[in-house]
Amino acid sequence: MGVINLMKKSTFLVFTMPSFLMMVFFIAAPLLIVIVQSFQFNQDVLHTIEREKCDPFGCKTEIVTVPLLDTDGRKIKNNQWVGFQNYSNILKFDQLSNIISEKGFSWKDIRSIDFYKALRFTLTFTFLTLPFILILGLCLALCVNALVNKLKGPVIFITLLPFIITPVIGALSIKWLFIGDGILTSFLEYLLDKDIAIFSSSWSIEILMLFYRVWHTTPFAFVIFYAALQTVDKEKIEASFVDGANRFQRLRYIIIPHILPLIVFVSLIHLMDAYRVFDEIVGFSASGYITSLQWMTYDYLKLDDAGNRYIGRASATSILTMIGIVIILIPILKKTFKDQKERQQ
């Protein structure tokens, strides 16, 4: 309210209204539409027609299924309100309860349900990559910070290259190194004197995808931590030298507490981004072995043999993905708000 008291309300509205309208049109409205669609069954009304198909050797009549059009030439949609049926079809609680009652928590049987198979990989991918990104990013920042000034610029540029590369292109580059007669695959085969097929099993592809995400995202953590190191109080560092503190003690008691808010920031960004893993599956052509929640959304939006898209299920999967992101962020956000209140007191 202090800002509003310093200026007229009309002036305040003039400054804030564009941002507010942008948030409504590009965030709130699409989200509301997706929520509504997740409770609906949307499908084109189809009918069969005879169509003559000709080639250099003659013509023949074939029967094809096409969408039914109205008088204005638009597709006629079959929209039904189905409540939580889309969520039920995705989560399959009945099938899950039957598996648990008959075989207990048998992961081999539970992962036969697409959603839980995708959820397992999404969570594994998200939480396994996080500590590597934080630790490697901090180590790189500390090493670069210790370099002489002449070397810092070139090293920073080289370190940021993986983050600059488009994700799909980066994934394809890693794939080409290991697939078939790739450079690294050929080298390993020569070294071990046996054939290697890294892309023949899901676990090896998954390891490559984890490696790629760490390689691609670590530069982001590095540049954030490196910028934070420039703001560390040098007087505290000098005082720690006088007190006889070693490098590890300076890191633990001075540097990490100082950059802790940025560690939380990097963690939040990574968790939100990694939970929506999609580029790696496309780049590594891994959809036959591995699926994620974001891939499920894309898969539902692809045309089936009848020319339909499962928009309702895709919307439901998107909402479940958003709920999952909120759940994994809650502990970090609670800790952040708690620390902020303590500082204010």
State where each predicted segment sits.
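A structural signal for multi-pass alpha-helical bundles of membrane permease subunits
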Residues: 4-345
